[in-house]
C-alpha cells in the first residue's frame, strides 16, 4: 500500500507499552494513525502520524477534538484496544457514519449483568447470575444459587475483584472486595454493582473472533488459559496452538456465535471467554475488543494472523485478512512475586534462543509488589513469550526461561491496590 494513500484511523488511548506496543505497531502497518489520549506516551511516536491531547473521560471534549480532526483530513475509521473506551468508539463511529458496532451492543458487553440477561433471554449457555447491592443480598443470592459461587464486579476486567466463595462467611468479605475493586482507571467508566454467579467447573479458554456481519463469526484462534490458585482467578499464562482441535468444534462455534448474536455485535474483533464444562461450553464474558495479555501477539506468532490489522480493517470498512500463514504454538507466562515488599533486584541469566520471542520486566527496583493470595495483575514482575512446534514444547521452553530469572524482594510491607 502506498504510504500517501493509507487511510486515517483514529485510535483512542495508548495504554501500557509492555502490553500494547504490538497492537499500535500493527495498526500503523496499513494506516495513518491519529492518537487521542490524556497524555501521549513517548513510546507511541514511531507509530503515529499525529497526536491530540484530550481527556478521554470528557466525551464532549473528545467530540470537539474529533470534529476538528475531521475538518483537516478525512477520517476512515475509529478504534481502540482499551476496554475503557470501547463504548465511546462505538458512539463516535455511529455519529461519524463510519463502520462500527452498535453502541448499545458494546455497552451490553461492558455490563456483565446485561450480558447475562441477554444470554438468558436467547437461551445461550452461561452462568446463573444475580446482581446485588449489599453483602446481605450477596449472601442470599449465594444461598439461592448454591455453593461454590463467584463474586465479581459488574463492570471491571483483568480478574480484578473476582473471587470464589465456598462458604457463607466468605461471601461478605468477597462482596466488599468486589465493590471496592479498581483496575487502571477502568472503574471510572464502569457500571457499578456486584454479581454473584454460579461457579462453572472446567478449563477456561478464550475464543478470538472476527465478526463480519450478524451471525457471521470467524474463529481465528483458541487461547488456552492458565489460572492461578483459587479463590482468585489471576491469569498466569496463555497458549495458542494453530491446530487446536477446538477450532473445528461445532458446539463451541454454535455457543460463541449465539452469544455474539444475543448481545447484538455485528462487526469487530471480539475476545470471548468460555468455560468447558461437562454440560458443554458456557459463556463467561464477551469483550468487544482485542484480547489483552498479549494474546494477539501469540495468535500472530502461532498462525500468522494479525488480529490488530483485522480490527483496523473492519473499523475502516475493509475486508480483514484472516488467512493463516504459520502453523505452530506460542505461549506466554507471567512471573508473580512469592513475597510482598519492594523489589530490590531483578535479573535474568544470559539467555539466547530463536524461540524466545520476548522477555520483558514489568517491575523494576523499588517497585512494591504483593504476593498471593492478594496479587493483582499490577504485581506481575515479568513475562516471557516463546514459540514452538507444540504446546508441550512451548511449556518446556517457558520453564527454562522462568528458571533463568532471579528476583530479590524485601518483606514485609502493606499491600497496595491495582493501579497499572
Q: For each predicted feature, which ranges?
A:
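Conserved ATP-binding module of the ATP-grasp superfamily
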Residues: 125-127, 148-151, 166-202, 237, ...
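ATP-dependent carboxylate/phosphate-activation module, predominantly the ATP-grasp catalytic core
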Residues: 191, 198-265, 269, 276, ...
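ATP-binding N-terminal substructure of ATP-dependent carboxylate-amine bond-forming enzymes
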Residues: 1-105, 136, 364-370, 374-379, ...
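A conserved helix-loop-beta module that forms one wall/lid of the active-site cleft
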Residues: 95-161, 183-185
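ATP-grasp fold ATP-binding core
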Residues: 119, 142-165, 183-202, 207, ...
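Peripheral (often C-terminal) accessory segments that flank ATP-dependent C-N-forming ligase machineries
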Residues: 33, 121, 312-420
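Short beta-strand-to-turn element immediately C-terminal to the catalytic PLP-Schiff-base lysine
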Residues: 132, 162-167, 210-212
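Short, well-ordered beta-strand elements within core beta-sheets of diverse protein domains
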Residues: 163, 198, 241, 300, ...
